[in-house]
C-alpha cells in the first residue's frame, strides 16, 4: 500500500511541475500582486482539483466522456474562459507604462476574486478529468479499499496545495517582484499569450 501512495505521489508531482494554466496564474499573481492574493488563487485551484479528482474517484468521468455534447460544451467553455483571461492580461500589458513605482499595488484585487479566478482557471481545463480518470484507473483497482481510495484523494489535494504554495512563495520574493516591475509589460503579455494559446488549444482539440 505504501508503494501505491508513493507511486501516485510521484506521478502527481510530475504532473504539477509541468507548466500549465494553474502554474502561470499563480506565478503571475504572486509576482504582480502579492503572496496573499496568490495563496487565495492557490486555494481556488485546490478546490478545483478536489472537484475533478472527486468526479474521477466516483467514476462520474465515464459519464462525461460518453456524453459527447457535454464533453464538447465543457471543453469549449473552458477554452473560452482561458482565452478571456489571456485577453485581459494582454490588454493590461498594452496599457502598462514604463514606470519604476509599483503602481499596480494600489489596486489589489479582492481576495475572493483571486480565489474565484483560481477556481475557474482550474475548472476551465477539463483535460484534468482525463488525467485523474487515468490515475484512478491505473492505480486504484477493485482491490483497493474505500479508505485507501480516499487516502489517495487526500494525498492529491495536499500535494497540490503544497506545490502551489511553494510556487506562490517563490514568485512573491522581493527579488522576483523587482524583476517583474522592470519587465511587467512583457511578462504580462507573455502570460496573456500563453493563456490564449491554452484556450485555443482546448477549443480546437475537442
Curated annotation (Swiss-Prot):
Keywords: Cell inner membrane, Cell membrane, Membrane, Transmembrane, Transmembrane helix, Transport. Pfam families: LysE (PF01810). It is found in: Cell inner membrane. The chain crosses the membrane at residues 1-21, 44-64, 67-87, 150-173. Residues 22-43, 88-149 are periplasmic. One of its GO terms (biological process) is threonine transport. It is a multi-pass membrane protein. Its main location: membrane. Residues 65-66, 174-206 are cytoplasmic. GO terms for cellular component: plasma membrane. One of its GO terms (molecular function) is threonine efflux transmembrane transporter activity. It comes from the Bacteria. Belongs to the Rht family. Conducts the efflux of threonine. This is Threonine efflux protein.
Amino acid at each position: 500500500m505504501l508503494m501505491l501512495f508513493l507511486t501516485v505521489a510521484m506521478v502527481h508531482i510530475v504532473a504539477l511541475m509541468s507548466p500549465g494554466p494553474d502554474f502561470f496564474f499563480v506565478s503571475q499573481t504572486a509576482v504582480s500582486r502579492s503572496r496573499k492574493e496568490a495563496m487565495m488563487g492557490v486555494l481556488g485551484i485546490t478546490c478545483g482539483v478536489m472537484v475533478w479528482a472527486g468526479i474521477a474517484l466516483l467514476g462520474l468521468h465515464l459519464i462525461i466522456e460518453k456524453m459527447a455534447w457535454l464533453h464538447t460544451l465543457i471543453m469549449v467553455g473552458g477554452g473560452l474562459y482561458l482565452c478571456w483571461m489571456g485577453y485581459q492580461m494582454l490588454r493590461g500589458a498594452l496599457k502598462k507604462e514604463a514606470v519604476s513605482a509599483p503602481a499596480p499595488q494600489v489596486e489589489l484585487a479582492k481576495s475572493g476574486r483571486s480565489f474565484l479566478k483560481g477556481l475557474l482557471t482550474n475548472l476551465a481545463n477539463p483535460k484534468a478529468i482525463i488525467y485523474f480518470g487515468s490515475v484512478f484507473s491505473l492505480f486504484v483497482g477493485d482491490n483497493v479499499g474505500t479508505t485507501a481510495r480516499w487516502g489517495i484523494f487526500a494525498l492529491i489535494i495536499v500535494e497540490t496545495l503544497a506545490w502551489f504554495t511553494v510556487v506562490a512563495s517563490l514568485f512573491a520574493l522581493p527579488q522576483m517582484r523587482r524583476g517583474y516591475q522592470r519587465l511587467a509589460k512583457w511578462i504580462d503579455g507573455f502570460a496573456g499569450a500563453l493563456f490564449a494559446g491554452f484556450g485555443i488549444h482546448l477549443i480546437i482539440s475537442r
